[in-house]
């Protein structure tokens, strides 16, 4: 049996017509993360790096991004790769707003920050940086992997996009690779989802299910991990063979007072 459809009829689809674009398990996971981050929409991705790659697709050749000078190595490698395609990146100390401002140019479109940063745990003041970004009409993109929504909600502090390597704290069970992108802006959410449908880096239904399972214990895991990390950091801080401890929970850490 054959069926002829005109173009407009072909565009009428069920929400779950094509699993790569969406499926019930993935939609439920995205709703959960959106609720945790205070977002209007979330896109679940196949990894944290896939999430960052997807966000970079929002920009065009010649666009300039300002980035933390202390970043996960995989992110800097990806940015180096993107330079071959025409994107420009400047790495700055995002804990110093005075030096930060001088890197803004007419081609600057966004700021990409990890806070705490990987690996030296630098803390950037998201409220102040978001105010600066808004004044210059720049997107603020925050990798929230290290703190998770349990400890920090960048969207509520003025960020436009929040990224997670959900492989880590969100999942917590060391048995999946996953990522996510959340935003509080409806127009931006539509752009991100359209890119996601096109590039096809979505998370599989099984991995979505496993991530949902992991998020159920996020609060109790994060509370215990923070308590243990503080005890270990204090012990190391007193150890005669340890010269420096990078942990923002220590009172002498330069970012300790930032909330």
Q: Where do the PLM segments sit?
A:
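Walker A/P-loop NTP-binding active-site region of P-loop NTPases
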Residues: 39
